[in-house]
Design a protein with these regions (language model features):
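Structural alpha-beta junctions
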Residues: 1, 61, 82-96, 182-194, ...
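Structured catalytic cores of large enzymes
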Residues: 1-87
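A short acidic, often aromatic-flanked loop/helix-cap motif at beta-alpha or helix-coil junctions
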Residues: 9-13, 98-102, 199-200
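Intrinsically disordered, low-complexity segments enriched in small/polar residues
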Residues: 21, 26, 139, 245, ...
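Catalytic-core segments of thiol-dependent peptidases
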Residues: 46, 67-173, 177
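A general structural signal for short secondary-structure junctions and capping/turn motifs
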Residues: 57-60, 102-107, 149-154, 180-185, ...
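Active-site-proximal C-terminal subdomain of hydrolase catalytic domains
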Residues: 159-264
Length: 264
């Protein structure tokens, strides 16, 4: 079943958890009020229907702003994944992308964000990786993303999927020590990531976390809710790998088990 978790930071204080619950409560209250207004009168229903029609038309005309960043060495699979939500050519690579340049030309808060970067169990940053096939003099493992990049002025994307190892690891961490919790504290409504090592490929075809991410975004673009999109992506991964190789290997099993949803 689709399950979304509401994480909390370490310590005895519950401020981080309460802020998330308060935000969700407000969101639900707005939805309930909207439904109640639609049911009060014919005129209200008519106006609500007209507002929904206008909103849908505006969405059709206005293109959502999205964000994507991958380690340079994983450009090929990451580009195919990102193409599910935006132009593959818009995917940023690290190197050369750094925290100082990641949001360059980002006119507004991103709706969707996809990251395929390195993560460490005990480090708050995510890292890129130079493509070993190039002659570049860029750092081999540059910092690509830090928790301080997003705040109340620079809101985090609405929905994020990250393939970073330990991207969803929150054990014994404060909010500033885990990017996923920083995201949730600064505007992200749902975050999907791995609690441990994530597995992918440097080339095609897509496997493990790459395949999961591609199918997840495909379902989201079709209007499927985030929880069901993740559940269906896991089911598709299990079905395809079983059909292709007759079983689920260790990487497949860990991918299905380790990717979780935070938020709602």
């Amino acid at each position: 079943w689709p399950v979304g978790r509401i994480p909390d930071e370490k310590g005895k204080e519950a401020v981080f958890l309460l802020e998330q619950l308060r935000y969700l409560n407000n969101e639900y209250a707005v939805k309930v009020e909207a439904k109640s207004m639609r049911a009060t009168s014919f005129l209200s229903s008519l106006l609500a229907g007209l507002a929904a029609f206008i909103q849908n038309r505006l969405r059709a005309v206005q293109k959502d702003v999205n964000l994507g960043c991958s380690a340079e060495v994983w450009k090929l699979p990451s580009s195919e994944v990102y193409a599910a939500i935006d132009k593959a050519s818009a995917l940023k690579l690290s190197p050369p992308t750094t925290p100082e340049t990641l949001l360059d030309k980002q006119a507004s808060k991103a709706k969707f964000a996809y990251f395929n970067l390195h993560g460490l169990k005990d480090a708050p940053e995510w890292y890129g990786q130079r493509d070993f096939r190039t002659q570049s003099r860029d750092p081999e493992y540059p910092i690509a993303l830090t928790p301080s990049l997003f705040d109340n002025q620079n809101k985090a994307p609405e929905l994020i999927l990250s393939e970073a190892c330990y991207g969803a690891n929150i054990l014994d961490k404060k909010a500033d020590d885990a990017i996923c919790m920083t995201f949730l504290a600064t505007g992200t409504r749902a975050f999907v990531g791995s609690t441990c090592i994530a597995y992918g490929s440097v080339a095609k075809p897509l496997i493990a976390a790459d395949l999961l991410a591609h199918d997840f975004w495909t379902h989201v673009q079709q209007g499927v809710s985030v929880g069901y999109a993740l559940m269906r992506a896991k089911m598709t991964l299990a079905r395809n790998m079983t059909a292709n190789q007759g079983y689920l290997d260790g990487e497949d099993q860990k991918t299905i088990l380790s990717f979780v949803l935070y938020g709602d």
